């Protein structure tokens, strides 16, 4: 069964589905891996290998079945995308799968991931899909799913989608035809709702007039919305990488490459700069001297503000295992609590719901504040950081100097292309021995974290220590072991 798209007399895109013997041919050439498809942020990989049009088509059909069976009420699916060259193709294919299952699709085009999450929660939609690989390079892409509450699919629902997909492909069975085809609508006007809530999340007595702010938009999903909302609040905005560009998204720019932002902030005499990733669900900042302000600092500043306003239950912040020990100790010295989770904003979100925490996030810049939404939002976080600086009457650099001294922390990545070897790295005995040696040597003055990336073919090695020399030594030792036995 193959679904084609066509426009009717009203210009709406509808689907036509017919049986064919060729369904799944592309997937037969690129079989699904034995390891789980869903990582820490949906399905992600290199386009043309794991991700292709055939997989997106089948995935859309299977996701439609699961969502229709589990969401409280039927409704449309909202689809947004970033600027990658492959995003149009994957959007079209997954739309065909959804509409062939009888689900209506609202396509909103280029937008940040948090926009899809917000609209899934605040319209009659039964879910949302974002086509993006976040901070990954241009040749990658990904598919993120949200439920009707704007939350990423639970592990249970994601597993149901994956199980149905595997059964469909492995049995090479034909899908049962829907009694009626779903329709497709272009609903870009919905983005205005998201823009309005961004502006309304800032206190009405705060404006950014007189502040000069540099925005690194990473050639990605934030290029239209971020400048618009900062300007609407009175800021003087200087934009870098401010056009959608599928060839250059995240390339030497954005939240993973801050050099150009640091230079621009100093060159233009800006108060601060912020850098988004390709889908704008995370943000990092730099102060007027070009010093990096990561997610730990943002959590600390925002936590202080909410604590002073009595809006932070139990003075609790949820962070991940990557959070710096210097941040944790400083927050505890203020009477705060910090709970760590595994890496991934989905884990942070789950712990926030479980504990009733209102603030959580990651060092990498995914920040969630339940006072303003249920998902990490880079643009919203950047707005609040700028507002906090304005309200404080001090510079961002002064706030950093008065906060905490981070422990020396070194993070290195080793590329491991073999998916099964990467996912089963804990079975590597020499690496486990090396980790134990490093941790024993540093004792309670440092820590080691080794993990497989949930979004890229990497083994990540992090060593943190009071002593920079010790951190450097053990990082190099562990990297050598990973390269020898896994790479």
UniProtKB/Swiss-Prot annotation:
Gene from which the chain derives: glmM
Protein name listed in UniProt: Phosphoglucosamine mutase
Record-listed Phosphoserine modification sites: 134
PTMs per UniProt: Activated by phosphorylation.
Reactions that this protein is recorded to catalyse: alpha-D-glucosamine 1-phosphate = D-glucosamine 6-phosphate
Keyword set, alphabetical order: Isomerase, Magnesium, Metal-binding, Phosphoprotein
CDD domains, per database record: GlmM
Cofactors named for this entry: Mg(2+)
